[in-house]
């Protein structure tokens, strides 16, 4: 099986940190990009988190988003442009935002599943 090149958004949050840890221990994933909404001046698992989301996503096959709704739509806009698959773990969307996600899902594959944190 070919490895999945993975980008994780919201890499400094609890779920982002868990995803980094899990992806590093799973031979099916190759962690290629980390993004955060603020500049981080240290490497995490050998990768420096980027504020430039579009450049970060180019090498990925799959983007996992654990940010906030506002950031999720920035992720979806870029992922749609680059034709990338997205897993959304972000919660707290309004009904209008849920409809917008459905529209994006007609352009790119999206798996949306809230409450993926450990213990749920």
Give residue ranges: language-model regions:
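Hydrophobic beta-strand scaffold residues
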Residues: 31, 49, 86-87, 110
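N-terminal Rossmann-like NAD(P) cofactor-binding module of classical short-chain dehydrogenase/reductase
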Residues: 63-64
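Extreme N-terminal starter segment of soluble prokaryotic enzymes
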Residues: 2-6
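NAD(P)-binding Rossmann-fold cofactor-contacting core
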Residues: 22-45
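Short acidic low-complexity segments
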Residues: 46-60
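Rossmann-fold NAD(P)-binding glycine/threonine-rich loop
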Residues: 70-82, 89-118
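N-terminal Rossmann NAD(P)H-binding glycine-rich loop of SDR-like oxidoreductase domains
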Residues: 8-20
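Residues in the short beta-alpha loop(s) of Rossmann-like NAD(P)-binding domains
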Residues: 12, 35-38, 92
């Amino acid at each position: 099986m070919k490895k999945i090149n993975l980008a994780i958004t919201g890499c400094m949050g609890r779920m982002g940190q868990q995803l980094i840890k899990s992806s590093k221990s799973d031979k099916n994933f190759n962690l290629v990009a980390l993004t955060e909404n603020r500049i981080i001046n240290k490497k995490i698992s050998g990768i420096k988190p980027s504020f430039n989301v579009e450049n970060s996503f180019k090498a990925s096959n799959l983007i996992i988003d654990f940010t906030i709704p506002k950031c999720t739509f920035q992720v979806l806009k870029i992922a749609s442009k680059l034709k990338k698959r997205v897993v959304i773990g972000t919660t707290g969307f309004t009904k209008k935002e849920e409809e917008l996600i459905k529209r994006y899902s007609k352009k790119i594959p999206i798996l949306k599943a809230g409450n993926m944190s450990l213990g749920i």
